[in-house]
Amino acid sequence: MSSQIKLTKNSYRAEKQKLNMLGMYLPTLKLKKALLQAEVQSAIRLAAESTVTNEQARDRMYAFAELFSIPLYTDAVEQCFSVDILEKDVENIAGVEVPLLKRVVLTSPEYSLLDTPIWLDSLLASVKEYVVSKIYAENAQERLLLLEEELRRVSIRVNLFEKKLIPTTSQTLKKIAIFLSDRSITDVGQMKMAKKKIQQHKE
């Protein structure tokens, strides 16, 4: 028996209180784990969809690849990669703060509609679509990583409660109870022996 375990009534009460608290807290942890599992699955789908959207936008942009190097339009194309407004917030999901992307506004290059070919509008639109979709895909991935990390942390705590803390505390409680019961029986036996000796002396 571990020397750290105090075989006293106070220790028994403390261990019983600890076991009750663990038992009360475990359902909350398991509920949070279930919520996080659902949110992670949702985040996985969103991240996958965002990635596909970004890849499709990239392919559409690459269709104009040969036109990117035309010096006359290089400045206009480069400006489309500049972000004017990136509006973000924080969203609380199952106790986890994750980034919420609210609005993305890119720089709108100025050019003469009369002096530029019609396809330039399509080229610049494809660049903007790619940049915006990439920002949203990166945000979705960041949300997923944060939720997965919290799920991992909570899962470890649930396992700790179920596999170690609760069983160990229960076992400690049992050891103390057995010791106190044995000592009580011994004490009763000694008292009976003492009374018997006293009675014998009186006789």
UniProtKB/Swiss-Prot annotation:
Instruction: Report which superkingdom the organism of origin falls in.
Output: Bacteria
**Per UniProt, what is one GO molecular function of this protein?**
proton-transporting ATPase activity, rotational mechanism
Q: Which UniProt keywords apply?
A: ATP synthesis, Hydrogen ion transport, Ion transport, Transport
A single GO CC term for this protein reads: proton-transporting V-type ATPase complex
Pfam families linked to this entry: ATP-synt_D
**What InterPro entries does UniProt report for this protein, alphabetically?**
V_ATPase_D (IPR002699)
Query: What's any GO biological process attached to this entry?
Result: proton motive force-driven plasma membrane ATP synthesis
Tell me its family.
Answer: Belongs to the V-ATPase D subunit family.
Biological role stated in the UniProt entry: Produces ATP from ADP in the presence of a proton gradient across the membrane.
Q: What's the name of the protein? A: V-type ATP synthase subunit D
Q: Which organism is it from?
A: Chlamydia trachomatis serovar D (strain ATCC VR-885 / DSM 19411 / UW-3/Cx)
